[in-house]
Amino acid sequence: MRPVNERTHVLTIAVEDYFHVAALRGAVRDAHWSRLEPRLERNLDATLELLARHSARATFFVFGRIAETQPELVRRIAEAGHEVASRGYWPRATAGMSEAEFLEDLHRARRALEAAGANRIVGYRSPTWIGARELWKLDVLAEEGYLYDASINPRLWSFAG
């Protein structure tokens, strides 16, 4: 047990390239991603090195598609002792997804992450925030064996992700 006066911090990292973020959706089409210089691997390596230097651990939320196309990144995260958690399969908003679509996204992401070398996937963070009308997704996550969700934004922003 930790001493009462010892501080504990939680660090989570969204594993995505700069052009995956929701803020660029209107400016950069998915079809153009292959034309852009990827920075994910370089930035991930720098992050893992920084965490190792400080003996720190983090939770890395990874898209299933990244696990499929770059499984070595997931292996490096897991081998360094960090938690690998799910961000779903690919950066698309979960708002408006039916339960069947949401389940398929969860299953596809989990299969990809585990195939890439991640241990048991128990955490989830949606590519965009989960709002009040989507709280049913928390029940689905629990039924699928997830122990926590990090998708709820306590602020009422009109744009998030």
Put a short name on every predicted segment:
Residues 1-123, 129-161:
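Catalytic alpha-helical scaffold of carbohydrate-active enzymes acting on polysaccharides/glycoconjugates
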